[in-house]
Amino acid sequence: MTTVINRKYRISRRLGVNLWGRAKDSVNKRKYPPGQHGILGFKKLSDFGKQFAAHKKFKFYYAISSKQLRRTFLDAYKRKGYTADNFIGALESRLSSVLYHSGFVPTIYSAKQLISHKHVTVNDKVVNISSYRVKPGDIVKIRERAAKIPILIEAEQKQERKAPDYLEADSKALSVKYLRAPQYSEVPYSADMEVNLVVEFYSR
């Protein structure tokens, strides 16, 4: 897990933003790309380069593959309504996203780890698939046997993030109710995710 977390901070530096809003992210002090020539700064990007960079923000923020991200966008595009909000709603309904934004875990990676180790239930049934789509009214809960896991204790002590309005979190019970699909403006991103550029990227 330490290796994964260190790698994610390199991702932040490569993108030039504090993607997860963490105080210890190295991009806060070194606002240039990693590597031998990183100190030379960022190159000026073409329109496609900007779109591609925005796509990478979402890919890394949600810790999913390019294939999964593209599939999510295509599903959102086919639905009625504003494509960007459909896209965000689909990403935020992932079980790993709900758990991460509950504030019970410090990172999206730790959320995925808890889920894969069968420490998480949805409506009292164990679900070990991070991409599971949570529905409005569903209750996500961390099982009691996992309550003493260090990353949960750390997150509770630091309280770096509060649950957004579309989630109803109970820190004592380690449970969170998914109320509704959010719009882009409601998600507590710590960086400008430029969702409009992602729409352009997949609409080429």
Curated annotation (Swiss-Prot):
- What's the domain of life for this entry? Bacteria
Q: Which UniProt keywords apply?
A: Ribonucleoprotein, Ribosomal protein, RNA-binding, rRNA-binding
Q: Which GO terms describe its molecular function?
A: rRNA binding; structural constituent of ribosome
Gene3D superfamilies, alphabetized: Ribosomal Protein S4 Delta 41, Chain A, domain 1 (1.10.1050.10), RNA-binding S4 domain (3.10.290.10)
Q: Return the Pfam families for the record.
A: Ribosomal_S4 (PF00163), S4 (PF01479)
Q: Does the keyword rRNA-binding apply?
A: yes
Check the record and name the CDD domains matching this protein: S4 (cd00165)
SUPFAM superfamilies in the record: Alpha-L RNA-binding motif
- Every copy of the S4 RNA-binding domain together lies at 93-156
Asked whether the keyword Oxidoreductase is assigned, the reply is no
* Position of the signal peptide: none
Which GO biological process entries does UniProt record here? ribosomal small subunit biogenesis; translation
Q: Which GO terms describe its cellular component?
A: small ribosomal subunit
Q: Which InterPro entries match?
A: Ribosomal_uS4, Ribosomal_uS4_bac-type, Ribosomal_uS4_N, S4_RNA-bd, S4_RNA-bd_sf
Give the HAMAP family listed for this entry: Ribosomal_uS4_B
Functional summary from the UniProt entry: One of the primary rRNA binding proteins, it binds directly to 16S rRNA where it nucleates assembly of the body of the 30S subunit. With S5 and S12 plays an important role in translational accuracy.
Family indicated by similarity: Belongs to the universal ribosomal protein uS4 family.
Please give the subunit comment from the record: Part of the 30S ribosomal subunit. Contacts protein S5. The interaction surface between S4 and S5 is involved in control of translational fidelity.
What is the designated name of this protein? Small ribosomal subunit protein uS4
Query: What organism is recorded for this protein?
Result: Wolbachia pipientis subsp. Culex pipiens (strain wPip)
